[in-house]
Amino acid sequence: MKHFLTYLSTAPVLAAIWMTITAGILIEFNRFYPDLLFHPL
């Protein structure tokens, strides 16, 4: 278990998890409010 936690705390793994969560939030936001991500200038 200690080695698994060490693996999870490495930078590439944390970056992948963070990008996955961010993409999920953006996808769900875009699903409910499809016009708010692209504001006309």
From Swiss-Prot:
List GO BP terms, alphabetically. photosynthesis
Q: Which UniProt keywords apply?
A: Membrane, Photosynthesis, Photosystem I, Thylakoid, Transmembrane, Transmembrane helix
Topology relative to the membrane: Single-pass membrane protein
Q: Which residues form a coiled coil?
A: none
Q: Which residues span the membrane?
A: 7-27
Q: Is Membrane one of the keywords UniProt gives this record?
A: yes
Q: Provide GO CC annotations from the record.
A: photosystem I; plasma membrane-derived thylakoid membrane
Its annotated compartments are: Cellular thylakoid membrane
Please indicate which superkingdom the organism of origin belongs to.
Bacteria
**Keyword match Transmembrane:** yes
Q: What does this protein do?
A: May help in the organization of the PsaE and PsaF subunits.
The family classification in the record reads: Belongs to the PsaJ family.
- Kindly give the PANTHER family that the UniProt entry links to this protein: PHOTOSYSTEM I REACTION CENTER SUBUNIT IX (PTHR36082:SF2), PTHR36082
List the HAMAP family hit by this protein, alphabetically.
PSI_PsaJ
Q: Which NCBIfam families match?
A: PRK02733.1 (NF002743)
Official protein name in the record: Photosystem I reaction center subunit IX
* Organism in which the protein naturally occurs: Thermosynechococcus vestitus (strain NIES-2133 / IAM M-273 / BP-1)
* Lineage, uppermost ranks: Bacteria, Bacillati, Cyanobacteriota, Cyanophyceae, Acaryochloridales
